[in-house]
Amino acid sequence: MELRTLGSTGLVVSRLGLGMAALGRPGYINLEHADDLARNYDKAEMEGKAYDVLNAAWDAGIRYFDAARSYGLGEKFLGNWLSLRAVSPESVTVGSKWGYTYTADWKIQAQAHEIKEHSLATLQRQWRESVGLLNGYLDLYQIHSATTESGVLENREVLRELARLKSEGIHIGVTSSGPEQGATLRKAIEIVIDGSRLFDAVQATWNLLEPSVGPALTEARAAGMGIIVKEALANGRLTNRNKEPGFGPKLAVLQTEAQELGTSIDALVLAACLSQPFADVVLSGATKV
């Protein structure tokens, strides 16, 4: 698989990355997620399935892995797998995120699956947790789903703590979601601490159903930031799992294009993301081999 440098960070990444969101917890928003897990939510079973996917990803050449504190046991599974496989830290790039706390207690129908808090105390606590769970495999630490409304991009205490981590060799990123992604990313591009741009990378939702953040990602790339694209398959809504009546005509177009190219709909949609000139890494949320 093609490797490249993530923006100006010097971190080497594969064009495809693997996200741990659907592998680390039993309840997730991907369509038919329960079926992918065969409705077996035993923690040991899920860890074993995560290892199967991680091994397949590694063997396919994937060298970027993305986790978060709110991904259930995702960081633990990833950290354990990296250690058991004795992966050299120089041969892999690992990113994680802070700002959400997992609260579902391994339940599928929990009242709340996560709580968002972008405070200094949360950053300091979750940083320690992430480093420990990932067994030291951590290169990029990202604000999880920053928005212009959350205030985290104006919180000087948080920004200075992130700058301190950066001074110790950790690359700093920000992720975004929702209709205001562009405004969030443009604000992040402008943040400078002690004469240096704070954020080294951005992670945003871009796919064929939601491409609106594209211009902002182009600006971030021009500024030297690494670009990670998430939700390329729109959590399954850009596959034949999407049974919404209004999606039928779009699915037919995708099926026709995929057939003409001799490929699958999944591969076609991922290729559309990979072809964007701003994209360094496109994340897959695979849950089975």
Over which residues does each language-model region extend?
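Conserved, mostly hydrophobic/aromatic
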Residues: 6, 18, 57, 65, ...
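Active-site groove signature of glycoside hydrolases
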Residues: 129-151
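Active-site mouth loops of central-metabolism enzymes
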Residues: 24-48, 108-124, 149-150, 179, ...
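N-terminal binding-site loop/beta-alpha segment at the start of enzyme catalytic domains
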Residues: 1-93
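Short, well-ordered coil/turn segments that N-cap beta-strands
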Residues: 11-16, 60-64, 87-92, 135-139, ...
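A short, structured active-site edge motif that brings together acidic residues
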Residues: 90-103
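Beta/alpha (TIM)-barrel catalytic core signal, keyed to glycine-rich beta->alpha loops juxtaposed to Asp/Glu
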Residues: 47, 145-289
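Short, acidic/polar
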Residues: 41-57, 116-134, 180-192, 265-269
